[in-house]
Structures are given as C-alpha cells and as structure tokens.
Amino acid sequence: MSEMKNRKHQLRQRRVVRTRAKVSGSAERPRLAVYKSLKHISVQAIDDLVGKTLSAVNDKGLTGKPVERAFEVGKLIAAKLIELKVENVVFDKRHYRYHGQVKSLADGARAGGLKF
C-alpha cells in the first residue's frame, strides 16, 4: 500500500511543479495561491518577484457549508486586494481540481471584483 501512496504523492507533486512553472505573480498581478485542508480553505496573494505575501484569508470563523465558506473567502480576499489597488491576479489552484470549493473561491473572487 505504501508504494501506491508514494505514487499518488509523486503524481500530485508533478502537477504542482507543472502548474508553478506556468504561473508566477508580480506586484501588479499577484499569484492567488489556494490551500485546502480537510476542514478549511485558505488563499494568499503572493508577489513572487519579491517573495512577499500581500494578503491572506482563511475560512476559520466563517459558518455555512464548505462551498459557501469558500465563496466568502474569495470575496474577502478580493476586498483586501482592492484596498491595496490590485485588480488583476493569476489564479494558482496548485494540484486541486477546478471544482467544488476551489471553483467557488474563484467565483467569489470574481464577484468581489478581481480579474483573472
């Protein structure tokens, strides 16, 4: 069984590396990086040229179903970035499928005024 787990982990890491090779953020257009655990979802806006996180939001303290919380997280990160005068972002979904919570977070960010 550990060999199968190792193979899945290798495939996941390969997807992450492939995605990161294509996606890079700057101060004008930061990378919106998504992290999803079994209970929570978080997102941070990263300027890769400097290596600095501009803003970060997670769903701790929010109520509702996971997809609804992800939508709210998207709206919150959009509001924080618009305060910083950032409207354009690059969406980095990492190895997660663009479905469910990840899609809902992206939709919330768009609803908040961000452009991908």
Residue ranges and their predicted role:
Residues 2-116:
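Ribosome large-subunit tunnel/peptidyl-transferase-proximal elements
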